[in-house]
Amino acid sequence: MSNIEIKILDSRMKNNFSLPSYATLGSSGLDLRACLDETVKLKAHKTILIPTGIAIYIANPNITALILPRSGLGHKKGIVLGNLVGLIDSDYQGQLMISLWNRSDQDFYVNPHDRVAQIIFVPIIRPCFLLVKNFNETSRSKKGFGHSGVSGVI
């Protein structure tokens, strides 16, 4: 297991808000909370940046963090991430910000302390490129989008 350093940037995190945490024993992602003074309106079809009040430092170049939407917010309310996935590099040390996008037709309200996203840590493979003139031929070759059809017999 790797240790990830965390820094509290906003004093409200010490008093009222909890640090990222797993909701259940089987959770893969740690919930990230909105560090706000007051409720913020996210208008329909608009985006907003929500501060978390924390910074992390991964330090290990073989680990990255991904900020992902919470499934319930996306499915039930239409609230997803404005950048779809937030990629946190191992050398980033700034505040974690959540870009929320309201893809619904209804305004949505983000309250202080709301769980608005989740963060997971994943291993990274950092390959070296080998320059070649040609690849070894495969049965797929250059076939791309839709090449296997819709029903795709296995």
From Swiss-Prot:
Chain residues that bind substrate: R70, S71, G72, N83, L87, I88, D89, M97
Pathways per UniProt: Pyrimidine metabolism; dUMP biosynthesis; dUMP from dCTP (dUTP route): step 2/2
Catalytic activity: dUTP + H2O = dUMP + diphosphate + H(+)
UniProt keyword list: Hydrolase, Magnesium, Metal-binding, Nucleotide metabolism
Enzyme class: hydrolase
Gene3D superfamilies according to UniProt: 2.70.40.10
Cofactor: Mg(2+)
GO BP annotations listed: dUMP biosynthetic process; dUTP catabolic process
InterPro entries: dUTPase (IPR008181), dUTPase-like (IPR029054), dUTPase-like_sf (IPR036157), dUTPase_trimeric (IPR033704)
Gene Ontology molecular-function annotations: dUTP diphosphatase activity; magnesium ion binding
EC number(s) per entry: 3.6.1.23
Entry similarity comment: Belongs to the dUTPase family.
UniProt-listed HAMAP family: dUTPase_bact
Record function comment: This enzyme is involved in nucleotide metabolism: it produces dUMP, the immediate precursor of thymidine nucleotides and it decreases the intracellular concentration of dUTP so that uracil cannot be incorporated into DNA.
Annotated protein name in UniProt: Deoxyuridine 5'-triphosphate nucleotidohydrolase
Source organism of this protein record: Buchnera aphidicola subsp. Acyrthosiphon pisum (strain APS)
